[in-house]
Amino acid sequence: MITSIELRNFRNLENYKVLINRPLVIIQGLNGVGKTSILESIYFAATTKSHRSSVEKDMIQYDKPYASVKLIEDSKLHEIVLTPNGKRTTINKSEVRKISDYIGQLRVVMFAPEDLMLIKGSPSERRYFLDMELMQVSKTYLRNLNSYKKILKQRNALLKKNRNLTDYTFLNILGEQLYDVGIQIFDERQKFIEALNQKFKTIQTKYKDFEVEMLYEPNVTKENFLKHLKTKQKQDIMYETTTAGIHKDDFKLLYKGLNAKDSASQGTSRLIVIELKLALLEWIKEVTKTDAILLLDDVLSELDLERQNLFMSQLSKNHQVFITTALPINGHIDFQKIVLQEGETINAK
């Protein structure tokens, strides 16, 4: 459980610290006061990434040289410092030089309004979801993904520089390396999606008439991937890129057997993604034997009162949960309320 959050120059929070004393934390305040930034800081400290922007320097407050996040979780101090030149990560004040050794020390599951792009967005956004979640629990996946990206970059560079290439020896060597790593990523993604579908079945017993399924859509089968790399060199040379592989994979979220992208309303889409995050939470617990921290940004908006109560009742008491809201939350559940105003806590009890 996180017991302390300390931020410096992070977004609009210049000098912020709050102590946490309960598993369920409600962060309340008007829009723009920094509620989402608190969740983003926790996500950043866990994954070294922002869920809001690919431009990391945006997290550094304007005209400041750095941003930092310190979290105390189960007596372990996690710290990440961001400058325009890079990141520095430490655990208990000892530097962790390899990001691969740092990721997975603290596991989180995030829901944000941007996650609706898992339904409406591009394949690259859905691949990013697969990669981020698998990286948190599997060092092997992270290592394979980094290797795949490195080999793919080499192969694409070779394709671009040699439009008249006739000797495919080196191209084929890179192709074999790409295949060997790629099929391992393929297998892990497939197992991950199968596992989430099993979790969906359990969750759906509590959500009446709400059938959700995840359908993996690999760009190419393992057999055809190898065949492509061995026989389609001319095609790849012509396009100056590797035109097939796991870097083009996708998945669909189905609602009652139909593609949610085409059949689900905005409110239903939100519930589908919420269900996905709850399934993910249970999957992480099953695989790692640890409880991930759940971060919910504006999760209750667009849900009617019945759905809100149902959702709140599904939150496991084993997981620490942070929820942001612009509206007051009432009910019998025990929670710590943090009232935020212009980047400062005016009440935390």
Swiss-Prot record:
GO terms for cellular component: cytoplasm. One of its GO terms (biological process) is double-strand break repair. InterPro entries: DNA-binding_RecF (IPR001238), DNA-binding_RecF_CS (IPR018078), P-loop_NTPase (IPR027417), RecF/RecN/SMC_N (IPR003395), RecF_2 (IPR042174). Pfam families: SMC_N. Keywords: ATP-binding, Cytoplasm, DNA damage, DNA repair, DNA replication, DNA-binding, Nucleotide-binding, SOS response. ATP binds at residues 29-36. GO terms for molecular function: ATP binding; single-stranded DNA binding. It is found in: Cytoplasm. Belongs to the RecF family. NCBIfam families: recf. PANTHER family: DNA REPLICATION AND REPAIR PROTEIN RECF. The RecF protein is involved in DNA metabolism; it is required for DNA replication and normal SOS inducibility. RecF binds preferentially to single-stranded, linear DNA. It also seems to bind ATP. This is DNA replication and repair protein RecF. It comes from Acholeplasma laidlawii.
